[in-house]
A protein has these predicted regions:
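Terminal leader/tail segments of proteins
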Residues: 1-119
């Protein structure tokens, strides 16, 4: 088994948003978007996925990958001095195709604000 098995009671919803999302590391803005996707998944906090076109940081693909039975295989991205700060799905499964071309940030020292408030 690659990853974990699907739970028939698990739910993943992807919604478009017009919220103003800013991702920072300290004072450095890594990404800023007014067209994010919000992913709500059973048992997890909401995650904000931003279009790659709205990322200003110099992200590079890493060798880290993971598998989600609900979204598919992910690719991780790092900064020159910090690995694996974001991930995305190049070919997400049918129920989550809207997150293709988007990345989600989550790492030590990375903050995400939504409409001026911590996410």
């Amino acid at each position: 088994v690659h990853g974990h098995l699907r739970d028939p009671y698990h739910r993943v919803d992807v919604r478009r948003s017009s919220a103003h999302v800013v991702v920072r590391r300290g004072d450095e803005v890594l990404a800023e978007s007014r067209r994010p996707m919000i992913v709500s998944e059973t048992g997890l906090p909401n995650r904000w996925y931003l279009p790659m076109a709205d990322v200003s940081a110099p992200l590079a693909s890493s060798t880290t990958t993971t598998h989600c039975p609900y979204k598919g295989d992910s690719t991780y991205y790092g900064l020159p001095d910090q690995p694996d700060v974001a991930w995305g799905y190049h070919e997400p499964y049918d129920d989550t195709t809207r997150i293709a071309g988007h990345v989600c940030f989550l790492a030590d020292g990375i903050t995400t604000d939504v409409d001026g408030r911590p996410a």
